[in-house]
């Protein structure tokens, strides 16, 4: 009887772990589906050209977050002629393939004036896939100040996406500063747009 109970308990734990993983992948797939369906630039049949890496939990990190106090505003380079005012709000730290990675978190001065976006933060980054498998001017991951809990930020690169400049001209998209150009490969999130002219 004890042996049967142990077997049933093991099966239950295994099925629970499987369902949790399945639930994670399902939620990410829902995120990607919604991203494609509601895309602000790519329309109609062109949406078939949006590509993504297979969902991989390896690229989901509980990062240590360090707030940078009294960080000065600076003009961040963009893909166009207009520079945009940002500041380093903080830094995140995580380890990938035995490499400690540091990325700066930025806050837009313009978006702080918009009530719905005043807590918006983002991480623009380039990595070892940039220009090969992913857009040559980098990708973004964004979130809210409220997502930072006890100096921990969940960064899921499966949600990394391309700026609008990857699809069409006419936008001034922030270009990742040199501090956010890393040598490891983030093989997660959105890939290079097939119809990109850049």
Label each region the model flagged.
Residues 1-23:
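Bacterial Sec-dependent N-terminal signal peptides
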Residues 20-73, 83:
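Start-of-domain marker
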Residues 78-137:
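Mid-length scaffold segments of soluble, non-membrane domains
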Residues 46, 57-59, 71-78, 90-92, ...:
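Terminal leader/tail segments of proteins
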Residues 21-29, 161-198:
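Extended, aromatic/histidine-rich regions of cofactor-dependent oxidoreductases associated
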Residues 62-64, 95-97, 104-106, 126, ...:
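A structural detector for beta-sheet-dominated domains
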Residues 67, 109, 129, 161-163, ...:
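Short loop/turn segments at secondary-structure transitions that flank enzyme active sites
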Residues 122-162:
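Acidic, glycine-rich flexible loop segments
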């Amino acid at each position: 009887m004890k042996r049967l109970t142990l077997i049933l308990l093991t099966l239950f734990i295994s099925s629970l772990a499987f369902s949790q993983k399945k639930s994670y992948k399902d939620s990410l797939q829902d995120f990607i589906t919604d991203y494609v369906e509601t895309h602000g630039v790519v329309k109609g049949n062109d949406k078939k050209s949006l590509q993504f890496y297979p969902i991989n939990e390896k690229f989901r990190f509980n990062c240590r977050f360090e707030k940078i106090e009294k960080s000065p505003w600076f003009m961040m380079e963009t893909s166009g002629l207009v520079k945009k005012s940002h500041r380093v709000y903080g830094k995140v730290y995580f380890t990938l393939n035995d490499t400690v990675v540091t990325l700066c978190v930025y806050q837009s001065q313009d978006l702080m004036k918009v009530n719905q976006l005043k807590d918006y933060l983002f991480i623009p980054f380039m990595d070892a896939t940039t220009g090969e498998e992913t857009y040559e001017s980098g990708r973004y991951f964004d979130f809210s100040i409220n997502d930072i809990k006890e100096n921990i930020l969940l960064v899921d690169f499966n949600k990394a996406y391309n700026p609008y400049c990857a699809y069409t001209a006419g936008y001034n998209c922030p270009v990742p500063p040199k501090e956010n150009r890393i040598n490891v490969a983030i093989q997660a999130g959105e890939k290079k747009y097939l119809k990109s002219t850049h």
